[in-house]
Amino acid sequence: VRAIISTGKCNSQEWLDVMRTAHRLDITTSATMMFGHIETIEERFEHLARLRQVQSEKPAHAKGFIAFIPWTFQDAGTTLRKIRRAKNDTTGEEYVRMIALSRLFLPNIENIQASWLTVGKAVAQVCLEAGANDWGSIMIEENVVSAAGAPHRFTSRSIQEAIREAGYEPQLRTQQYEDRALPEGIEEQVINY
């Protein structure tokens, strides 16, 4: 799958080996999975199995993969759609199932992130009940998903409200998942891609 959708990039084994090396050097990484294009269900779980294996090999002192973020293929205007006719038919229910299965299948990766950017508020809220412990962040700059037409927009305040509506207390964090206090004035910051 990677050879088809990521031409010109390293192959899966090379990427996994880079992650292993990073973990041995105590460099924290994250892992993603874009799905809903040309892959099969079996290939999705092969992806998860490889991540679980790499995480199990990390040194005891290292965090390894600090988070796993599954996100749905955003097909608008992509070469993959034009040439391969790949179309994202992933439903919200299917995305929630992927979050739940990721939580079960990846017990050695502490944080599972719901991709509000690709699935929107309502689905991301359900994901918090299905095993996601991270809503994701407000990105200062995001070019990949937004270029493919992801329609979802939030302010810091609206993210906090959405998390509270789902029954959880929002917590600002660093990239290393350390808690931070919410700075003054950030509540109204509008992120528009």
PLM features: residue spans?
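Auxiliary Fe-S-binding modules of radical SAM enzymes
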Residues: 23, 48-52, 56-193
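Active-site glycine- and acidic-residue-rich loops that bind
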Residues: 10, 35-51, 117-118
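Conserved short-loop catalytic and cofactor-binding motifs
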Residues: 3-6, 32-35, 86, 115, ...
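Short acidic, glycine/serine/threonine-rich loops at helix termini
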Residues: 2, 41-44, 80
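Hydrophobic alpha-helical scaffolding
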Residues: 5-12, 37, 41, 88, ...
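Core AdoMet radical
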Residues: 1-24, 28-31, 37
